[in-house]
Amino acid sequence: LVDPVSSLIEPLIKLISGLSEPRTIPQIEVACGDNDVALIFRHMAAMSNEDMQKLHSFGREQSVQMFLQPEGLDSTHKIFPEDDNHLLHYRLPDYGLVFQFSPQDFTQVNLAVNRQMVARAVALLDIDPSDEVFDAFCGIGNFSLAISRFAKKVTGAEQSATSIARARDNAR
């Protein structure tokens, strides 16, 4: 893991072990943007007020966004900071692109690796300005939008309605 995520491991261990029912948290998802980290705590039992305070304190002390997911994906909600902004963002500066995404969207958590993957894909494709490219499983547009800088036309296909909407927003 890379910073800032790797620096959260020890504090997360301390946080989880200090909760009243640590065994009811089977997973923590991590999402990283250029300037933000978000953690989604999947929990199988109601959180006590004391545990909620610990989560808020952790978010404040570590400067991370905190989300809870008590049931399915639709149950995910932000608990810290208490604002309406649920999106993170990352840039692909070589392509003049900024991507907004939800912590639940499928993205590469290591931004440096993501930039390298996109650059490598673009180089391997050796795109000609007359090319028309089809990107199956385009997600939020990570590869499609970078490729669109070079190709005549790019068509992205995606099953997730949320990802399709996010890709459209990112294309604007």
Positions of predicted regions on the chain:
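A structural signal for short hydrophobic beta-strand segments in well-ordered beta-sheet cores
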Residues: 28-30, 90
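Carbohydrate-binding surface patches
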Residues: 30-31, 36-44
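Internal alpha/beta scaffold segment
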Residues: 2-24, 33, 45-66
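Rossmann-like S-adenosyl-L-methionine
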Residues: 46-172
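Charge-dense, low-complexity intrinsically disordered segments
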Residues: 3, 42, 108
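Residue-level recognition of the N-termini of beta-strands and the immediately preceding loop/turn
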Residues: 25-28, 131
